[in-house]
Amino acid sequence: MTASTRNGSPSPSPAAPTATEQESKSMTTTPANPPETKSQTNGKGSGTAQSSQKPASTSANAKDPLRPRRKKAKRACFACQRAHLTCGDERPCQRCIKRGLQDACHDGVRKKAKYLHDAPNEALLPGIRGNYYNQANTTRNIPNQRGNASNSNSNKVSRQSVSSANFYTPQAARSYNVYVQAKSQQSHVRPAVMQDASMNPSVFHAQSPSSTQNFDLSSNPQTQNLSSAMSQTASSVSGQNQDPFGAAFFDPSHPALFNFDIASMNFGNRYGALEFGMLGHMATGAGDTPPSDSATQRGSIGRSSGTFTAQNFGDSANNQSPFLFGDPVLNDWNPTGQGQANPRNIYNQNAVAGQMGEQNPHAFAIESAPMNFASPSSTESPQMTTTTPFDEANANFSSRTNLMHPTNTPQQSRISTPGLKHQGLHVGVKRRYRSPSSIYESVKEPYSYTSGFHSLTAFIQRRFSPQKTLQIAKALASIRPSFIATTKTLNQDDLIFMEKCFQRTLWEYEDFINACGTPTIVCRRTGEIAAVGKEFSILTGWKKEVLLGKEPNLNVNTGSSLSSASSVRGSSTFTPRNNNTHNSIDPHTGMPTVGGGGASGRTQPVFLAELLDDDSVIEFYEDFAKLAFGDSRGSVMTTCKLLKYKTKEDSAALFHGKEETQQGGVDGSSGTGTTTSGDVATTTATGTSTSNGANANTNGNNTNPNDPSSAASSSASSALQGPQQSPRQTWGKRGIAGEAGMNQLGFRDGKVECSYCWTVKRDVFDIPMLIVMNFLPCI
């Protein structure tokens, strides 16, 4: 049989291929023979594929080694695959053209591997691979591969439309335009997509990148037909249970996946912001995770399960902006500093059809702009701003809204976020942005811990008795060799770096102290206070400026029972060794200094030993000696007694108040307006009243402790006039409430009994850097 006869024959039978085809198959698959065998083979006729590709002069020498090798096709057509012949990449291929089968030439289907047995055929097409997302819509449109020529022709168009309607193509990812079909193909794909009963309209409310693309529904008349068709489809499937999480949520090739606005995320570096954005995307966009309020607290648009109708595309009656995704938070998402635009301009006109029909992956940006959840008034139209400029070509959108008629289909219930629409809820707005770079720029010299330990030693010798001083000295002496061993190799730069580490760690703890409602202080390893919370000041009466050494320390309360009497009458239990080395007041600035150096002296913060009574100080330094170079993660939980802040005037007023109370208890009354009820009485500046209020005298500015207003006023006056509480105060069943109640703690003997927990944090040189302490009063 000649080659011309074979080219004119109909489609070859798969059961009995011709002898020439078998010969061609053997010629294309059998390796080259020895030279003597090749001379015998050259006399035979060449195969069909060789005769179609090579001219007649070279067809007689099919096994010539100098003949250029044919390039293998990526996938053979259906006819060549059945005939086991070599095909080309072009469609239709040359063999089908010569045989008159160009209309039925399409890619053949290979046998799938075992691990791809459950994968649909459309996902295995060339160029698709991992970009297949909507299996439910494509399994119904698998082409009939064994049909006749007319069915194959129609299925070819349907397959091309479906594959392009369900996958991301590389061209779409680069050009941000995923709707790239021609007009002839759009007429075929839209009825098939609209009439498919498995179409899920609720996925159109899923999140999408709100800061990447722009769209306008009016520029393309075909999208208007899409909107009208969508309204009919939504009304027919609104009663069915919808699954908005059918499509994949992660596509690494999507251009908007890593489109994070780094400047608005309050991160100091790009890598931390990208990591946070990716974690937020994975957490809020998970396929099996239902929508929640947490998904919108960082600026992401959460999923909703509402029904997709044409009303989401058209303008409302009050000229309000349409909401494509049905999320009420999208209405208030108004980044500061951006121009106002309409939500319908978020995507471009071609991307809308891609979002609607192609089931793109649900990738979106996290915190793409500073958050502002302020709710607009009922008379204002909701507005939203985007990061893309306003397209002036979309200005005629309002003139074409008559083609989009809203339907009366009731939307399904969705989770709203009314808590976010509160005027006082500004995530990240109230927080003052601080940069730690100022710490590294401001620290120029190391901190003098030597002067701090000298001042601590002088204070301990001045306040404590020799026996108690010896106990504290033994505890500090036990860790002195460890301090020497860790610091002897440090130079000037290391000490400066150590101070920078301390200031940087303290910078982090300031936010913790402000956010925590527990009385907290942070001090150095010398015991000098470095940071304090306002709750601690309320509890003890120590002002923050006094504790940090910015104001003079006039406290005379040392916890001794004779401290107040000694300050008034001038008596003391023992003579201190050095009275002029600590807390000397600078005559020019009025600030406490070290060493009495005047204006050139170093300001001295308050030591931790000044805030505790004698027994608590000894117990603290014994525990500190065990924990300083011991367990780096260890902590101590015990009880202590905090000393209230008292000046000489406070102690004198309290001492005279006790004498008047004793006289009033003997005489029954006094000329200064003192009344008693049993043995409990309180003293004010102009008069006194009983604590229970039963026999209260109305002389002067007497207050009733049971009255909240009077309690607040008494606390305010006590802050200015000193402690005014009797030594025996009883509390009711309600206990202590508010600042006033905390101020009244410890007026009996100037001590507040507390339970406290503290730990030691070390620096990079494994040296104790700071001590963090939390207190809770025992009521």
From Swiss-Prot:
Could you tell me where the Low complexity compositional bias lies? 227-238, 560-572, 672-719
GO cellular component annotations, sorted alphabetically?
A: nucleus
Matches recorded under InterPro entries = ERT1_acuK_gluconeogen_tf, PAS_13, Zn2-C6_fun-type_DNA-bd_sf, Zn2Cys6_DnaBD
So which domain of life are we looking at?
Answer: Eukaryota
Query: What family does the Swiss-Prot or TrEMBL record give for this protein?
Result: Belongs to the ERT1/acuK family.
Q: What does this protein do?
A: Transcription factor which regulates nonfermentable carbon utilization. Activator of gluconeogenetic genes.
Protein name per the record: Transcription activator of gluconeogenesis BDCG_02812
Q: Which residues bind DNA?
A: 77-105
Its subcellular locations are: Nucleus
According to the UniProt entry, which residue ranges have a biased composition of type Polar residues? 25-61, 202-226, 291-322, 333-344, 401-416, 573-586, 720-729
User: Which keywords does this chain's UniProt record carry?
Assistant: Activator, DNA-binding, Gluconeogenesis, Metal-binding, Nucleus, Transcription, Transcription regulation, Zinc
**GO MF entries:** DNA-binding transcription factor activity, RNA polymerase II-specific; RNA polymerase II transcription regulatory region sequence-specific DNA binding; zinc ion binding
Q: For this entry, list what GO says about its biological process.
A: cellular response to starvation; gluconeogenesis
Q: Which cysteines are joined by disulfide bonds?
A: none
The UniProt entry lists the main location of this chain as: nucleus
